[in-house]
């Protein structure tokens, strides 16, 4: 692995253990990243086992192509297409385990040219797949005040959303200013807009950068579709292992597993026959254990793991 691709997979042992790997099983790593989870799964598969990995980042695909293993297949695309890819390969209902490692990876954050980090100057891009969609810089030049405010508040949970949005709009409307195209420009703009009473330990731009990244990549919609797709293609007793990194992601995963574990709900106060109740179906999955967080040792080794949460479910 090249130096630029070095990456410490978060909750590696716990997430793979949660899949309960069968040597001859079929597995899907929905977020290849730099391959830490995929390589570990491959190391536990026998000759007849199969691993299919997915990623929409061209750099991740390039790294995946260095794996010369007949048991391994890489798919270039968003993980929301997991059900479609599984059906293409004749895997629907046959998959023994699916793993998702959500959010942005360390190599993406550390590569200034990708524009994900406010700590490094680079193009204000933030796209997971730079070949599709529009960069954040273009969106910020076109979006109105209300839209920018909504994105920061909804996806960054930033109480200063309106204040930051006003600063961005005021900046771009001043003809004397350079176009807003660099991460350092946006980070400074947000820092300057933060109230003097700002006392959070995090950088003032943390939440807004997260919000713009989530929005420009439609991350929450991707997660919702991917979770539903995974539940659809898993075989009975197949496992779903999901690592999230912020509260928006984790709430989605938690609610999904809870909903799938409860099954269809009978409307309160509406009389129904036993046959009608049975026709609604039953629970589709069950939660395996409680949410798992990284150990103190892992956090010391990899501080970025601090906010991670692992949840595991099993198809019934």
Curated annotation (Swiss-Prot):
Reaction(s) catalysed (UniProt annotation): cytidine(1402) in 16S rRNA + S-adenosyl-L-methionine = N(4)-methylcytidine(1402) in 16S rRNA + S-adenosyl-L-homocysteine + H(+)
Its job: Specifically methylates the N4 position of cytidine in position 1402 (C1402) of 16S rRNA.
Binding-site residues for S-adenosyl-L-methionine, renumbered to this chain: 35-37, 55, 79, 101, 108
Source organism superkingdom: Bacteria
Main localization category: cytoplasm
Listed Pfam families: Methyltransf_5 (PF01795)
GO cellular component term of the entry, any: cytoplasm
Subcellular compartments: Cytoplasm
InterPro entries for this protein: RsmH, SAM-dep_MeTrfase_MraW_recog, SAM-dependent_MTases_sf
Protein name: Ribosomal RNA small subunit methyltransferase H
Catalytic EC class: transferase
NCBIfam families documented for this protein: 16S rRNA (cytosine(1402)-N(4))-methyltransferase RsmH
Family of this protein: Belongs to the methyltransferase superfamily. RsmH family.
Keywords: Cytoplasm, Methyltransferase, rRNA processing, S-adenosyl-L-methionine, Transferase
Single GO BP term: rRNA base methylation
EC number: 2.1.1.199
GO function terms (MF aspect): rRNA (cytosine-N4-)-methyltransferase activity
PANTHER family per record: 12S RRNA N4-METHYLCYTIDINE METHYLTRANSFERASE (PTHR11265:SF0), S-ADENOSYL-METHYLTRANSFERASE MRAW (PTHR11265)
Residues spanning the membrane: none
Gene that this polypeptide is encoded by: rsmH
């Amino acid at each position: 692995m090249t130096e630029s691709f070095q990456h410490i997979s978060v909750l590696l042992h716990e997430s793979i253990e949660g899949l309960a790997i069968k040597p001859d099983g079929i597995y899907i790593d929905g977020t290849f990243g730099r391959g830490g989870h995929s390589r570990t799964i491959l190391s536990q598969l026998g000759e007849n086992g199969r691993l299919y990995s997915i990623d929409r980042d061209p750099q991740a695909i390039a790294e995946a192509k260095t794996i010369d293993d007949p048991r391994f297949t890489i798919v270039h695309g968003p993980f929301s297409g997991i059900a479609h890819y599984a059906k293409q390969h004749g895997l629907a209902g046959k998959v023994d385990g699916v793993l998702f490692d959500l959010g942005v990876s360390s190599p993406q954050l550390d590569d200034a040219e990708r524009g994900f980090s406010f700590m490094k100057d680079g193009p204000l891009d933030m796209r997971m797949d730079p070949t599709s969609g529009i960069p954040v810089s273009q969106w910020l030049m076109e979006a109105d005040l209300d839209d920018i405010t909504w994105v920061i508040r909804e996806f960054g949970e930033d109480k200063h959303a309106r204040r930051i949005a006003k600063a961005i709009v005021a900046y771009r409307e001043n003809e004397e200013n350079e176009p807003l195209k660099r991460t350092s420009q946006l980070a400074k703009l947000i820092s300057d807009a933060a109230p003097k009473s700002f006392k959070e330990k995090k950088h003032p731009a943390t939440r807004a950068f997260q919000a713009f990244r989530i929005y420009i990549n439609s991350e929450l919609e991707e997660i919702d579709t991917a979770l539903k797709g995974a539940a659809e293609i898993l075989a009975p007793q197949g496992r779903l292992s999901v690592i999230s990194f912020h509260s928006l992601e984790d709430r989605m995963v938690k609610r999904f597993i809870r909903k799938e574990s409860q099954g269809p709900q009978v409307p309160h106060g509406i009389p129904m026959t036993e046959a009608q109740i049975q026709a609604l179906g039953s629970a589709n999955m069950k939660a395996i254990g409680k949410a798992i967080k990284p150990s103190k040792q892992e956090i010391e080794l990899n501080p970025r793991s601090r906010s991670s949460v692992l949840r595991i479910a099993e198809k019934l």
